[in-house]
Structures are given as structure tokens and as C-alpha cells.
Amino acid sequence: MDVINLIKNLKQILRTANNERHLIELKNIFVKQHLLPLYDELKKSANKKEMGLLINNFKQQIEFVTDQILKELNDKDDQVDLKKWTNKTLFAPFINNGHHHILNSIIDDIASFFKKLNFEIVSGSEVVSPIYNFDHLNIDENHPARASADSFFINSIKMLRTHCTTTTAQFLENNVNKDIRIMSFGNVYRKDDDDATHSHQFNQVDFVWVKEGLTVANLKWLIDSLIKYLFGQNLKTRYRLSFFPFTEPSFEVDVQCFKCDLKGCAVCKKSTWIEIMGTGMLHENVLKAANINDIRTGMAFGVGIDRIAMLKYEIDDIRYLYSNNFKFNAQIK
């Protein structure tokens, strides 16, 4: 990649701008054409560290040149004598193509993956009954999540769902098929203090597959395939025994850090592994609550879309995803 000539070309393009807005639009077009494709190449690169430094340097030069041309543009405006000349030209706005928000794009990617496996894609209501949010998912009466300090209750029989498993539980109960495949997605709500890694509202994807003969081996194959589909690499996965009321056995799934080549970094907290989702085989009490009393088994997992976005695009603050900041949104398409 010839960075020097690209930057020269950028200067020529930006100097055609008539105002600051036009300048930013021209810069965004350049970034979309020349910078963003490099991130796709980075996924396939054998030397990610060297290429990552090159991309970062290219990005910094783009910002520096943009600021430089903007200053020239502002200085030029200051020199105009309005008494002698007035620009009466009406410029037509430069229209950029719209694009999906990063969270919607990731949800679309996951939905596309599951559609190929004949899964039914559902969303469901965000206002649900505690019966489906807790009771049908084997969450006992003394579980902390049932407290008003942890969940948003509208009244004694209505609440904001705390996970999309609630929706899959509802569809599971009403499904008469022998082979049940459901993927649900949408907003979930928990009483967390908003900070760099937590939000009271976030997006989640949940899946349930019920069929005769399903085992942990099937579950691991499906998750490994999804991770490869999302990140475009043959990332190693690690399954750690855990506990969730609605699955048995339960696992936490980690992926090998794709940023540091097993050297340890801030993303993986020096562990070389990144926790990405919870999963397991559906608990027999969950199946019974859905009137499934035969020999079929089920498997499920839930994953936060916000977390996938932060890991995939190296976003260090979850609040950026909900800020409606044009400069931030324009960088990720």
C-alpha cells in the first residue's frame, strides 16, 4: 500500500471542499474506499501486528491532513471581504448512502448464519411475565435476579425482560414441531450502572435447538462455526464448566485472543483468552415447562451483541454504541 501517494491524493480531494461539511463528507468517502477495506485484509493477514501499525499510522495521517485542510479552509474564509463580494451560490447537499448501525449489522450477520440452518428468527415483546422470565427457566424464587434491585418490574405480573431466553421459552412452549430451531434477538434490561462495560439496556441474541439425539458435541460444533463466521478466523475456543439455572451442563465459552498473538494484551487482560458467551444443554425442568416430555434434548446459548461489537471493532466504551455520534458511526460500516 502506497500511503504517501494516497495521502497526497487525499490532500487534493479535500482542497476541493467548499465548506467544513463538504470536507468531512469527502474525507468519509476516502476512508470508506481506502481505510476500511484494510480492516478486512487485517483479518486474513499473517502479520497482524505489522499491518495493524500500518493501518493506525494511515488513520492518523488522514486525521492530520483533514485538520490541516480544515484550518486552511477556515483561514481562507476569514480573509473574505464581505463588503466587496458575497457568494450567492446555493450548493446542493452532498448525499451519502446510509448504512445499518453496527449492532444491527452484527444481528443481521448472526441471523443470516442461523437462517442457513433453518432456524426461525423471532424478536418478541420486551415486556414479559416473570413466569417466562424466571419460572419456566428454572430460576428459583430466591434468585437475586428476581429482586427489584436487579430487574425492572412494571408491576407484579409484568417486567422488562432480562434476557432473550424469555422469548425463546415462549416460542418453545407453543411449538409443536419435533425439530425446534429458534433464534431470538432484541433489547434486554438490567439494573446495572452505566459505565464503560455495562449498560442498563443492551442487545442480546439467544438460540434454542430441541431435537432427538443432540449432544454437547453438536453444541460445540455450532458455536465454533458461528465464531468463525463472525470473526473470519479459525479461532481456538475453550469451554469452562459453569452454572446457569436453565442449562445442565453449563459452560462459559472463551475464544483465543485475536489481537495479541497469544502475547497478552488489554483486550484479553493478559490471559490470551476472551470470554464471549454462556451456553449449555437445556435443563430438563425447562423442557418440562415447555411441555416437552419425550426423549428429545435441547441446547442453548446467549450472547451480548454489544460485547461482540466491542471485541470485533476494538471499542473500549459501550456508551459509544448508543451515543449517536456521527464521527464514531461513520468509522464503522
Swiss-Prot record:
Recorded name of the encoding gene: pheS
InterPro entries the UniProt entry points to: aa-tRNA-synth_II, aa-tRNA-synth_II/BPL/LPL, Phe-tRNA-synth_IIc_asu, Phe_tRNA_ligase_alpha1_bac, Phenylalanyl-tRNA_Synthase
Principal subcellular localisation of the protein: cytoplasm
Biological process annotations from GO: phenylalanyl-tRNA aminoacylation
Gene Ontology molecular function terms on file: ATP binding; magnesium ion binding; phenylalanine-tRNA ligase activity; tRNA binding
Organism, as annotated: Ureaplasma parvum serovar 3 (strain ATCC 700970)
Places the protein is found: Cytoplasm
Cofactor binding note: Binds 2 magnesium ions per tetramer.
Name of the protein in its database record: Phenylalanine--tRNA ligase alpha subunit
EC number: 6.1.1.20
Sequence similarity: Belongs to the class-II aminoacyl-tRNA synthetase family. Phe-tRNA synthetase alpha subunit type 1 subfamily.
Subunit structure: Tetramer of two alpha and two beta subunits.
Binding site for Mg(2+): 248
